[in-house]
Structure formats: structure tokens, C-alpha cells
Amino acid sequence: MAYGSALSDAITILSGYARKRQSYPIFLRVGRDQNSIYIDLADDTWQAVKITTRGWEIVDNPPVRFRRPKGMLPLPRPIKGGSIEALRPLLNTDADSWILIKAWLLSLLMPVGPYPLLIFNGEQGTAKSYNQKVLKAILDPSILPIRRPPKTQEDLMIAANNSWITSFDNLSKIGCDLSDDLCNI
């Protein structure tokens, strides 16, 4: 083990090497290059779904780099020929809300925000939590699909840093500070 000045020296040397090398953006779940969007399947193969104006395909070794926080689960391999409309019967939502949900899902395919917030509002037992779990499982499955509301700005930022979709359960109200913080993610 390196201690004291030896550790400090090693950090200084490695920092110097890092500063002289090319830097790369690191993405979480969804990344991009000049002409394509990539969705990390987060499996052992490190394959990704490449999306272009011509369609999509699964690729080995995508040209973008992804990070995978603890708790991130792999996405199932997509199958050609499906329709987003097959999702509608699984959700408790009306026709107008369904249009907003589809727009929200589409926005999540953009590697850089801003992103709209999706808020389910309703009485107890109206499948708000269930809807959140279903939608999160589509693009960002994780061990903890829904979290408790954040108590501090730091809690919110940690949650947002560790998942592509941050979903909170039993958020009875959104105060001004939390509203501002959510808009800054």
C-alpha cells in the first residue's frame, strides 16, 4: 500500500498523464456521436443499440463510452417490428396523457437535456407507482426503480447521477427549492 507522500506522488504523476491524454465524454445509458445515438444495453457484451436516421441496429464496441453505476440492470435485446402502442394497455392513463408519455419517452433518447418532467398525479390506488416502474423498466431498469423523495439537494444530485431516469414515490408536493433543483438536472 502506498502511504503519505508516495500516494500523493502517484496521484500527481497519474494526474499529469491524464491531462496530456485525449479526453472523452462519458455517458450514462444514452450517448451520442456526430450522427448517431447509442443506448447501452448494460450487459456483459458491452453492446449498444445504434440509432440513426436510417433505423437502429445492435453494435459491438460503440464509439462512445458509457459508465455503469452500481444497481444498473441490463436492457433486454430489442426486437424489430414492435410498436410503442403495445405499451398503452399496461399503463393506467387516458388518451391525452398517453401522448405526453410517448413524448417523454422519446425525449429520453436525447443524450443531452433539457428533459421534461413526467409527473403522475392521482388518488391512492391509481397505479402511479406502477406506471413509473413500467416506464423506467423500458429504458433504465435498475435494482431500485423508485426512490423515496430526496431530503436534500445533494440526495437529488446523487440519485440523478446514478440513473438515467430518476423516479420518486410518494412525492406529495414539490416545493420551490425541489422544483428548481429538478429543473437543473
Regions found by a protein language model. Give the residues of each.
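Short helix/loop capping segments that flank catalytic or ligand/cofactor-binding pockets
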Residues: 47-51, 129, 175-177
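Conserved AAA+/SF3 P-loop NTPase catalytic/coupling segment centered on the Walker-B
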Residues: 165-185
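P-loop NTPase catalytic core of nucleic-acid-dependent motor ATPases
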Residues: 53-164
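Conserved nucleotide-binding/hydrolysis micro-motifs of P-loop NTPases
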Residues: 45-46, 125, 172-173
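Segments of Walker-type
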Residues: 1-96
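Structured core elements
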Residues: 38-40, 119, 166-167
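Glycine-centered small-residue hotspots that permit tight backbone geometry or close packing
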Residues: 36-37, 127, 170
